[in-house]
A protein has these predicted regions:
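N-terminal acidic leader/helix
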Residues: 1-22
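Short, charge-rich amphipathic interface segments used for partner binding and complex assembly
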Residues: 24-60
Length: 60
């Protein structure tokens, strides 16, 4: 499994933590996680949290 597939799997696994069940994730969401890791020096878990929190805030 490549890193991008792993990131997508992690994103999908944590959707329910943010009441985002049913939200369709895209490659742009994976890009956002990668940007968070590189730009803000976040761990994978923290980057996923930041992206999902951002999606949640936009939808609420």
């Amino acid at each position: 499994m490549d890193m991008r597939s792993y990131i997508m799997e992690c994103l999908e696994r944590h959707l329910s933590d943010y009441d985002l069940d049913g939200v369709e994730l895209t490659e742009e969401d994976v890009d956002a996680v990668e940007r968070q890791i590189i730009k803000n020096n976040l761990t994978l878990n923290n980057a996923i949290e930041a992206v999902l929190l951002g999606i949640s805030n936009i939808l609420m």
